[in-house]
Swiss-Prot record:
Disulfide bonds: none
Name of this chain's protein: Multidrug resistance protein NorM
Positions in coiled-coil regions: none
Cellular location(s): Cell inner membrane
Keyword Cell inner membrane part of the UniProt annotation: yes
Superkingdom field: Bacteria
BP-aspect Gene Ontology terms: sodium ion transport
Role this protein plays: Multidrug efflux pump that functions as a Na(+)/drug antiporter.
PANTHER family hit by this protein: FMN_FAD EXPORTER YEEO-RELATED, MULTIDRUG RESISTANCE PROTEIN NORM-RELATED
Membrane topology label: Multi-pass membrane protein
Alphabetized NCBIfam families for the sequence: matE (TIGR00797)
Amino acid sequence: MHRYKKEASSLIKLATPVLIASVAQTGMGFVDTVMAGGVSATDMAAVSVAASIWLPSILFGIGLLMALVPVVAQLNGAGKREQVPFEIQQGAVMALLISIPIIGVLFQTQWILGYMNVDAVMATKTIGYIHAVMFAVPAFLLFQTLRSLTDGLSLTKPAMVIGFIGLLLNIPLNWMFVYGKLGAPALGGVGCGVATAIVYWIMFLLLLLYVTTSQRLRQVQLFTTFHPPQLNAQVKLFKLGFPVAAALFFEVTLFAVVALLVAPLGSTVVAAHQVAINFSSLVFMLPMSIGAATSIRVGHMLGEKSTEGARIASHVGILVGLSTAVFTALLTVILREQIALLYTDNRVVITLAMQLLIFAAIYQCTDAIQVIAAGALRGYKDMRAIFNRTFIAYWLLGLPTGYVLGLTDWIVEPMGAQGFWIGFIVGLSSAAAMLGVRLHWLHRQNDEIQLNYEAR
């Protein structure tokens, strides 16, 4: 029991800065929306549409680079810090390489908006935002590379501090470029893209300054030796990171596709769906942070050749995450009307949102299990298991169930948005079950198999 308490303490210390950094990231999006809305509804809508194109694109790059965290954690646990610079420098090369196709996708924004039949004025503002923010792609991915270094070494506070500096800088920079203050041009919603690009470059440079000057990282000697790009290392990193990137893509696109399928059901349904989704996304940051911390702890323990420690870290992560999920689920049910009132005063929307928030409360528990189990499996570098199981859960089980219940009369009368939320529960519960079973299978193997599995 003492080991479990000690592990829980270590986990919470790691997860708290990750959570706060996520809040800062969300805060930047909130500031963009509010300040663009101060210009016009069209500017605010343009920023929202641009975010729906920008975020899935950049998330794919983040997913690829997330593979570096367990790599660094395992090397750190094994006392092989001298090998860390090679991995991070290869990661930086990967970040620059994948910036090219991501920018290429962002360049196609005009075609995407044309396909969506977006209003011409809104489309122009959206394209302007994307063309500005695409300059942030290399900086954002290089920042993630360096964050993989600090997180992998169990130093999660630097990214938290720099994330809040970024948020604080984003406010005056938005004020300058959105409203045309201090000699800057008044760009409206496009100015949010300019501010975001500047902020991400500053955040990258600040983290670079930290990793090169911190006494805590003196032994790593990140840039003392230059390691040229190696094709084998790039292929290995891509193979390790691609399943994580794809799994993130499956999850993001699941919610995006459901939003499109709900759209024809009317503005009231769409508004209620958006209230429930937005609140769920905020709550999800809590188990997501615990999952990230679990990945670090499991990787570190495996580096120390302690399969028992890795098993305890996995169990503690799931227990802590499930406990917090039960608490937030109860609060969601009890306060569902007050939650809906934070978003709107339309009683029809509030009534429907309250129903959807009950579904959201149900899936918070299984969502916590699946994201933390996935974090533990990342610690084992079992990326393909995450890829396979999330694809089956989200796209072969969750989405079809939601579609059948929401829009057809094959089983029951069309349930509308409620049907899709039942689909979410089916998908996330299936993911939790399959990832949990996989993790349990790993834990049942003997030490030699587990350590060889980790080292493959």
